[in-house]
Amino acid sequence: GDVYKRQAQNCANVPEKGATGFYEACQSFWFVQQLLQIESSGHSISPGRFDQYMYPYYQKDMESGKITREFVQELMDCIWVKLNDLNKCRDAASAEGFAGYSLFQNLIAGGQNEEGIDVTNDLSFMSIQASMHVFLPQPSLSVRVWNGTPHEFLIRAAELTRTGIGLPAYYNDEVIIPSLMSRGLTLQDARDYNIIGCVEPQKSGKTEGWHDCLLYTSPSPRD
């Protein structure tokens, strides 16, 4: 009863009124992810740097004692399951080529901020743990690594690799940041990159990702 009441309260507040804590932020994230899937044909709609934009809510609630690490891990495990639930119909050839019905929802953990400081945090570790717990192909978990990555984080990522699930994918900041700068990004924007879909490094919030736009702008052959 209390759980459902809290869920109803969360849904009444977000995303319209903005999240006030980690639990509400998780609910808001899930609403937005579903809306984007529906609006944009549901392919490669990637959560990006989940551990970064969710961390302020986590930190605030942990300091006030509203949440525990165990509760946060449970919420993240649930989000991972829900992300794997999302699907879209494909023809047989596409299903075979994509090794199933993956939606390539890339979620990346670790890395550095715009000032070049490593920002691996508790949620970075919990992201890996969530994939360990649910053992599902979605979200497509990735990790950012560089010479400032904590050794413990590399070990934890390697433990997930050892399971054979094919996660996480590893992305080297030392190579990707200069490559993005060579394409016109500022150093600050390049440091804040995330991965879209399979392997595409892009800057959060500054890349147009509306992949089905031609469905609306191009004339239909049937017209």
Regions found by a protein language model. Name each.
Residues D2-S218, R222:
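Conserved catalytic cores of very large enzyme subunits
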